């Protein structure tokens, strides 16, 4: 269950669909429940009032659930975050009962899916790709003094506590729980034995294909006389590209150092100025 999972032709965050692909190759039957709204795109896969649609993309089985269309991080996105788990509960019984639910955490909106997992008595695994609300606090989007912040941390702690297993996509997940004193050694409810780290990894079949088929022709990249600093990824607030650009400005007199930034995102136009 990942609200933001997309069909392969649109997806840039490949973790969910790659996991599904290789789980199926290993003999598991996988269904991905996702929103009909494609994040950061003006696309709704459901053009009528249907509550959901089923689609198959190669070996990937998707159920797209209708949610509010939005741009940016305003009220409509919050409405969509509330709608998705509630509508998932409405349609879940139309499908065969699962043996396991893997949910990409969206604290606190996704916590309701735990109730369904317990109702059908299946293993419930929480996958953590972003720290909610820690990321928003670190970026200054939410102030620690905001009364909603302690509540969000409480929901996050509850979700990790209730999960049968917690899988972080980044290193330091266990340390994060320890720092919060949520682990059993600090009197908290979370057993660190159920906390794991699995990074996004690389699909070598894709990598080997792309490196042959999509070669970037740039003489500067081939220049062995200069040191290259290369960034490849989204250009958004969370990745703090301004710091890298400021570093490039400090080194602009060093002609033997060249910075390459490849990507796109909300901050690109402002940073180009």
Feature locations, PLM:
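N-terminal subdomain of nucleotide-sugar transferases
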Residues: 1-58, 171, 246-251
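Acceptor-binding helix/loop patch of EC 2.4 sugar-transfer enzymes
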Residues: 3, 68-76, 95, 120-157, ...
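An aromatic- and histidine-rich active-site surface loop
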Residues: 8, 78-89, 98-122, 126-135
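A conserved catalytic-core segment of Leloir-type glycosyltransferases
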Residues: 32-95
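Carbohydrate-associated surface elements
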Residues: 36, 169-172, 198-201
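Membrane-proximal helix-turn-helix segments that form the acceptor-binding/catalytic region
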Residues: 89-90, 111-120, 146-166
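Acidic anion/phosphate-binding donor-loop and adjacent secondary structure
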Residues: 178-197, 201-218, 240
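Conserved donor-binding/catalytic core segment of Leloir-type glycosyltransferases
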Residues: 220-239, 245-248, 260
């Amino acid at each position: 269950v990942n609200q933001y999972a997309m069909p392969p032709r649109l997806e840039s965050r490949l973790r969910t669909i790659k996991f599904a692909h290789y789980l199926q190759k290993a003999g598991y039957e996988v269904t991905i429940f996702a929103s009909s709204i494609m994040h950061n795109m003006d696309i709704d896969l459901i053009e009528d009032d249907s509550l959901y649609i089923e689609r198959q993309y190669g070996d990937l089985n998707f159920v797209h659930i209708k949610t509010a269309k939005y741009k940016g991080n305003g009220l409509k996105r919050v409405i969509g975050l509330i709608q998705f788990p509630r509508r998932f509960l409405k349609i879940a019984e139309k499908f065969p009962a699962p043996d396991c639910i893997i949910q990409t955490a969206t604290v606190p909106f996704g916590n309701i899916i735990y109730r369904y997992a317990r109702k059908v008595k299946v293993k419930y695994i929480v996958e953590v790709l972003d720290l909610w609300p820690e990321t928003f606090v670190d970026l200054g989007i939410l102030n620690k003094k905001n009364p909603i912040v302690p509540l969000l941390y409480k929901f996050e702690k509850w979700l990790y506590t209730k999960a049968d297993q917690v899988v972080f996509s980044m290193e330091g997940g266990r340390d994060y729980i320890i720092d919060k004193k949520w682990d059993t050694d600090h009197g908290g409810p979370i057993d660190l034995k159920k906390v794991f780290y699995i990074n996004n990894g690389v699909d070598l079949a894709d990598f080997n294909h792309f490196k042959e088929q999509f070669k970037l022709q740039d003489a500067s990249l081939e220049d062995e006389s200069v040191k290259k600093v290369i960034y490849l990824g989204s250009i958004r607030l969370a990745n703090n590209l301004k710091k890298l650009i400021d570093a490039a400005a400090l080194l602009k007199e060093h002609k033997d150092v060249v910075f390459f930034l490849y990507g796109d995102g909300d901050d690109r136009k402002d940073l180009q100025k």
